[in-house]
Amino acid sequence: MVRGSILLVMIAFLGGGSAPPPTILAGPASYADLVVLALGAPVVVRATIAKAARIAPDQAAGVAAGSARVLVKATLTTAILAPADVPAAIEYLADVPVDIRGKPLQLKGADTLVFLRGGAGGYALANARGQIGWSAATEAAVRRVIAEARRADPVITGVGNAFHVAGSVPGEAESQFFLTTADSKPVSLVVLSRPGEAKRLSVALGEVIDEAAGGVAKETLLWYRLACFLPRVLPGEASGDAALAADYAFVLQVLGPCGRTLP
């Protein structure tokens, strides 16, 4: 998967006077970017681009070099998220790259997922990069994010308290990290070490901390909120405890990088 900015990729084709094929809109650079798009848009649709007309440069302020602003007209395929009915034809502005001739890439016919704000009075992209290529896998991931968001799981803001306790036998130990959340819901991470066993991370979403609690599945909303919003080092006095610091480093290693590139 391409990392960094969301790119528009042109399919190579042979000349001969025929119209060029549509530009294929790439998907997001990471799962985290997909979460940013899905959570930041009150309207999410799948649509086919029918037309993309360039806006005159003197009427398109703030367009980055190498890009052009176009008025996109698209035909609705399906509404994935919408507070009200979405019309069969929608319009919105988008900034897209230009080719070597300075012309916007060909978008007509592109199958796309669009993340929008607005309503019957008109739509706008909820994120400057809120127009991405459709695929069954990407749509399924968007639907999962939206469904998980409706469960109102805690929004992680940082680490509160932490402690480390050695076990009764050499090599046995447990570290617990109590996280802070936007709504004060309890969340804790437990790192358990036992002789002859691999170190294990589990997460507890509640007051009760159970050794049987599960781990953190990748590419879930909980994983995103942990991987992208936990600090890189322990705050306060906990950072001076070598055992706690080592187990916290293990937490970050298990979670892996956030991968978010979108604002």
How would you label these PLM feature ranges?
Residues 15-263:
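Transition segments tied to proteolytic processing and entry into folded domains
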